[in-house]
């Protein structure tokens, strides 16, 4: 097992990793920018190191500063959390070059899944169903129109190096294709430094379903059920739940088995999530995230497995915590991402939290690093915290969520709490009858 882990992140995920380390008896090092000097994970860690000014590129993305922090403190492993350097294959390789353990997958798998075109080819080879589309990048010399006609309009133009909804454009008709290609390519170039794009069939009203996996890197891999992340705004997840209200037991078992088998063949190491669009009973691979996800608590609540703790244990050479047969999905869980944003315009609302009360009771969990008097800095994402609830049934879970949302107090800044209080009372949400465009259509109706 590792002796000391440096947590190369901030906010709630840094605190989440710190908790797992403490339960394993591992010493912790928090790193922070000057803007995060008063952060909760900095207060609770055994040691802390300031790694630079507020801007992420000068602090949390500053690899030399992180290496120096490891050397100063004697850390033997680095946990990257999510975001920042968590899916940076070069960072994993640099750590290995310095005899440091990267708590995550092998660098080759991070690189493979980071290239969306190669990821899709690999998924197809491993027997994972994929969205019909171009076999690779579509360049100026390719017959984009011919490919699009073969797929069938509408088509989606996507950045090969994309993520977070950037570099994605829909061409509803042949007339839209040229503009969609140039716009997506330009966006991709400015956001990711890579202008290459590819084409996929555009599904009209799909759900977004992802499968959580855990691999030991030696050919052992299991799946821990699915999460439904269909409630999204601008391709950003807002609400996640598991099991998915859209799936039946047979579909769940079939896709889970397919994915686990693929991860065994890949010899995947650690936690990972395979994301799918789901429409008319069919799954279509979108991408694989080779890190812990923001919404991992949903799976923890319904499987009773500590994913971050197991991620650390497996990175240190440990075995899988259970066989596939021992994994039992218990009850239902929902997570709401509460952001420091105006609930109507979604403008960021950084500032000082004057009052803070976290809801409690059976089956209620808050993953947050904020406290009364804490100042949310304007430099990073606007997550205040994640409210996660569990119930024996989805109906019980919704009632518990409604109660917890009404109980939660965050004053001094604007938050998206009012949005969730409204959503949890919406008939479509109560019925579990929603798709990835539902929330944006709902919001458009509210402001009309």
Task: Enumerate the predicted regions with their spans.
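ATP-binding N-terminal substructure of ATP-dependent carboxylate-amine bond-forming enzymes
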Residues: 1-126, 138-146, 179, 396
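ATP-dependent carboxylate activation and anion-phosphoryl transfer catalytic cores
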Residues: 6-26, 48, 71-73, 89, ...
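Alpha-helix initiation/capping motif
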Residues: 59, 84, 112, 137, ...
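Conserved beta3 strand of the protein kinase N-lobe
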Residues: 133-134
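Acidic/histidine-enriched active-site and ligand-binding environments that engage anionic O-linkages
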Residues: 147-156
